[in-house]
């Protein structure tokens, strides 16, 4: 006879929309989210009514939903296999054993099952969160920039108030930040609008004293959360974080060479500390990305981060399209952005999302739809700054409202600038989408706004990357050219000249941060 009693694991959370018969359900140790529709959605909805580690009787679910036990039994067996229910009460020992199994599986998967180039490319991707959002709508995802304070001083940081050398004065903390009561109210208001997931970032979120209170509030409310951090504030606290079951932790690692990483962070010993935290999180099976911006100082060694990720069962996340500061400092594009020759080589790395090669459709080019807005921020997702400004995303600092004084729903439904943004199409942009190289642009209206004070005018950063990718793709397609010259990526990177440190400094231009959109212009 099949088991009639199950338990809801402590590592699960999710949300059911009964009206739409749609449910999202997370296994927060494996880091996998599942989307359910129709009757299966309603069954998972019954599970979510039960507190974590609470008892679930199939007979009660059967009676509540008028579904036969014969139909429920195999479904619950599948849920048990996926770690979405447990056939026994979830003790601390069971959690530890499950973490150990998942951690070992993650490492073995990375080591024994290398992904093909096609599998790595970010085309035609779909996931449970997208499916749920498409079906239900509302505000489902929000990023909280908890503070711009940080335990590192990265030379490429785009945050307002960041410095480029130790003689410059940081103004990261020059703002009146939201309080814990503010966050609880805002989270409650967002939940009423459909919230299922939050990302906690900064600066570094653990530079915010109340971060653990916010995490506990999210956990108790059943909201999945990600954390983007350098790890410095997690020393001796990784188990504490793991016990709140983050959906994902992103750790910034810039090289496999400690001195290169520390040069970028401007904090001696930061590589060792971040790596120790990453190793501990890996052992605890906390889903993890290793985040790495590729720039001149680390171009010869950035690839080592992929090796580290493989050892830890993590996913490497590389960014080659570096952006200038939100407040108009041009230092990054002036001193740190890859040269044309360096960028051509790096774009042949299939770990790079902007990869150029025959495995990608049109060698990485994608035709832009002129009748749609090229950016999805500000529809179902937003960012909230440390002082409470509601903005489209962390790269796009135009203000739709001020949450210390306004209600989320009021801004979401009544803000004229937000309505204008949501109804924009690429046809209304001045240049974007009108050139042959635009197919190779990872168009960011936020970059446009930082540079020009409007999302409608093309930014130099966007165009630079698009033109390099376009030229490389067409030389490869039409001339048989390959910047690797028959060598491996790592061989070509090793042939690049060593980086010569230079004194970098702010180069301020216009500051358009935290202003409202100009409607119709």
Regions found by a protein language model. Give the residues of each.
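Acidic, low-complexity/disordered tracts enriched in E/D and polar residues
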Residues: 1-50, 73, 125, 133, ...
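Radical SAM enzyme [4Fe-4S]-AdoMet core and its adjacent flexible, acidic
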Residues: 2, 12-14, 171, 245-247, ...
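Short glycine-enriched, charge-decorated loop/helix-capping segments at active-site entrances
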Residues: 29, 170-177, 263-269, 451
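Long, charge-rich, low-complexity alpha-helical segments
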Residues: 35-142
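Alpha-helical scaffolding segments of alpha/beta enzyme cores, especially the outer helices
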Residues: 74, 185, 210-220, 236, ...
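Conserved alpha-helical substructure of the radical SAM core
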Residues: 84-86, 100-240, 244-247, 514-521
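Cys/His/Pro-rich metal-binding microdomains
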Residues: 151, 155-158, 376, 391, ...
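Flexible mid-to-C-terminal extensions adjoining Fe-S/redox cofactors in radical SAM and related proteins
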Residues: 397-521
């Amino acid at each position: 006879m099949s088991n009639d009693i199950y338990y809801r694991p402590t590592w699960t959370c999710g949300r059911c929309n009964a009206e739409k018969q749609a449910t999202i359900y997370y296994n927060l140790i494996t880091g996998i989210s599942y989307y359910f529709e129709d009757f299966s959605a309603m069954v998972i909805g019954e599970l979510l009514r039960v507190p974590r580690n609470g008892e679930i009787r199939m007979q009660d679910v059967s009676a509540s939903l008028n579904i036969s036990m014969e139909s429920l039994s195999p479904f619950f067996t599948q849920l048990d296999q996926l770690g979405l229910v447990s056939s026994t009460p979830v003790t601390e020992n069971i959690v530890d054993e499950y973490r150990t199994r998942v951690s070992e599986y993650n490492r073995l998967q990375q080591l024994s099952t290398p992904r093909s180039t096609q599998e790595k490319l970010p085309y035609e991707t779909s996931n449970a969160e997208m499916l749920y959002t498409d079906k239900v709508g509302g505000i489902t995802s929000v990023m909280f920039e908890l503070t711009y304070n940080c335990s590192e001083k990265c030379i490429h940081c785009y945050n307002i108030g960041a410095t480029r050398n130790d003689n410059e004065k940081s103004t990261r903390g020059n703002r009146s930040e939201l309080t814990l009561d503010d966050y609880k109210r805002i989270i409650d208001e967002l939940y009423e609008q459909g919230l299922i997931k939050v990302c906690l970032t900064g600066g570094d979120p653990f530079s915010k004293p109340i971060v653990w209170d916010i995490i506990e509030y999210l956990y108790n409310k059943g909201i999945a959360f990600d954390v983007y951090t350098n790890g410095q504030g997690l020393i001796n606290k990784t188990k504490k974080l793991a016990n709140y079951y983050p959906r994902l932790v992103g750790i910034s690692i810039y090289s496999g060479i400690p001195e290169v990483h520390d040069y970028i962070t401007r904090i001696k010993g930061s590589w060792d500390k971040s790596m120790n935290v990453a190793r501990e999180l890996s052992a605890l099976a906390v889903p993890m990305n290793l985040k790495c911006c590729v720039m001149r100082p680390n171009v010869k060694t950035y690839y080592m981060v992929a090796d580290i990720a493989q050892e830890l069962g993590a996913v490497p996340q590389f960014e080659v399209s570096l952006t200038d500061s939100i407040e108009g400092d041009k230092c990054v594009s002036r001193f740190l952005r890859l040269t044309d020759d360096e960028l051509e080589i790096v774009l042949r790395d299939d770990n790079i999302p902007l990869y150029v090669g025959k495995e990608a459709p049109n060698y990485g080019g994608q035709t832009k739809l002129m009748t749609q807005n090229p950016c999805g921020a500000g529809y179902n997702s937003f960012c909230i700054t440390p002082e409470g400004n509601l903005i489209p995303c962390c790269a796009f600092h135009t203000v739709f409202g001020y949450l210390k004084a306004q209600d989320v729903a009021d801004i979401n439904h009544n803000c004229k600038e937000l309505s204008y943004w949501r109804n924009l199409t690429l046809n209304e942009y001045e240049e974007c989408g009108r050139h042959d190289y635009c197919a190779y642009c990872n168009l960011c209206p936020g970059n446009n706004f930082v540079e020009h004070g409007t999302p409608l005018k093309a930014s130099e950063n966007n165009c630079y990357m698009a033109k390099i990718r376009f030229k490389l793709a067409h030389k490869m397609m039409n001339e048989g050219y390959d910047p690797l010259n028959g060598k491996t990526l790592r061989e070509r990177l090793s042939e690049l000249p060593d980086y010569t440190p230079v004194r970098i400094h702010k180069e301020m231009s216009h500051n358009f941060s935290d202003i409202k959109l100009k409607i119709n212009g």
